[in-house]
From Swiss-Prot:
The keyword Ligase does not apply. This is Probable dual-specificity RNA methyltransferase RlmN. The lineage of its organism: Bacteria, Pseudomonadati, Bacteroidota, Flavobacteriia, Flavobacteriales. The gene is rlmN. NCBIfam families: rRNA_mod_RlmN (TIGR00048). It comes from Christiangramia forsetii (strain DSM 17595 / CGMCC 1.15422 / KT0803). GO terms for cellular component: cytoplasm.
Length: 352
């Protein structure tokens, strides 16, 4: 059988492949086509209940209820920022909470989704890192975040979701298999049918997994939370850099580009008295020479401990000028959703 035999422990039906569903129905004396129907309801139609499956008989729906559950997420609380950004506090089936964000602009709507409850890493400037990792999200929990934000985009902005960034809670490359299964569902014609080129995975820099991403021929875009191109500084603000130093990261990124020819985006915050010197900017310029890239200079979004402060505008301008003079594409990115703690680095389940 393709489900748990203990009646009080029903299996989440979305853990089954389409082929497993087809075999289940054949074993129950039905046609394999019924499995295809159910699979379509679960993914492309994102059904949250077996009762939603209106082209399936009541008897079959009851049989599904007897054997399976659909562990869908629930938007427990939605907050709207003065700039239009929406933050969802998402309740999981085990009562844990993650957050996801809809970021609207004039031309697009972007979903910022979470991959873990908490985070595996220990970036000192990030509110999520203070939570520590409780567990990885499974593929359907990631998928459901995207579906919820797509629905909100259509409802509030009258257009479908256009882009997805894995920049919410968690380090996506530390939940590699589930993240990639979710991406597969999101991009499949049997799922949401989104182009993988509209999906960006943002990592703090896990060299081994960046190489695996390249070997697996992922068509997504890659962003790296860099924040310093000097090991002594990066280790101070991102302690895991002691294990995964910049030399290893550089090698992995060179490997990524050699396999994919896809340009990398570096996310970079300039902090007062941490990385706001010409020496820091020069180190970034040198690091950018290794592979084709662009740099996003990001406004810092403060968290409660107050240990980090945004550098003066002159420091950001110095970075921008130096990068541009060296032929490196650079964008100064304004934060969205700050007033509801929805901006980059602020997701900490405060609304839960």
């Amino acid at each position: 059988m393709y489900f748990c035999g203990v009646k009080d422990r029903k299996k989440d039906i979305r853990a089954l492949t389409k082929e497993q569903l087809q075999k289940f129905f054949v074993a129950e004396g039905d046609k394999s086509f019924r499995g295809t129907q159910v699979y379509e309801w679960l993914w492309s139609k994102a059904a949250h209940s077996f009762d939603d499956m209106t082209n399936i008989s009541k008897e079959t729906r009851q049989m599904l209820k007897d054997n399976f559950v659909i562990n869908h997420i629930r938007v427990d609380r939605m907050q709207r920022s003065s700039d239009g950004t929406i933050k969802n506090a998402v309740k999981l089936h085990d009562a844990l909470t993650v957050e996801s964000v809809l970021i609207p602009t004039k031309s697009r709507t972007t979903a910022c989704v979470s991959s873990q409850v908490g985070c595996s890493l220990d970036c000192q400037f990030c509110a999520t890192a203070k939570l520590k990792r409780m567990r990885n999200l499974n593929p359907d929990e990631i998928y459901d975040q995207v579906v919820a934000i797509d629905n909100e985009s259509r409802l509030y902005f009258d257009r479908p979701l256009s882009n997805i960034v894995f920049m919410g809670m968690g380090e996506p490359l530390m939940n590699y298999n589930n993240v990639m299964k979710a991406v597969e569902k999101i991009t499949s014609p049997e799922g949401l049918g989104m182009s993988p080129k509209r999906i960006t995975i943002s990592t703090s820099g896990v060299p081994k997994m960046i190489k695996k991403l390249a070997d697996d021929e992922a068509k997504i875009k890659l962003a790296v939370s860099l924040h310093s191109a000097r090991n002594e500084v990066r280790t101070q603000i991102m302690p895991f850099n002691e294990t995964f130093p910049l030399e290893d990261l550089r090698e992995a990124l060179e490997y990524w580009y050699s396999k994919t020819t896809s340009r990398i985006t570096y996310e970079y915050i300039v902090w007062k008295d941490i990385n706001d010197t010409r020496e820091d900017a020069q180190a970034l310029v040198r690091f950018c020479k290794y592979v084709p890239c662009k740099v996003n200079l990001i406004e810092y979004n403060p968290i409660d401990d107050g240990n980090f402060q945004q550098a003066a505008i002159e420091a950001t301008n110095m970075y921008q000028d130096m990068l541009e003079r060296n032929g490196i594409t650079v964008t100064v990115r304004r934060s969205r959703g700050k007033d509801i703690d929805a901006a980059c680095g602020q997701l900490a389940n405060k609304s839960a």
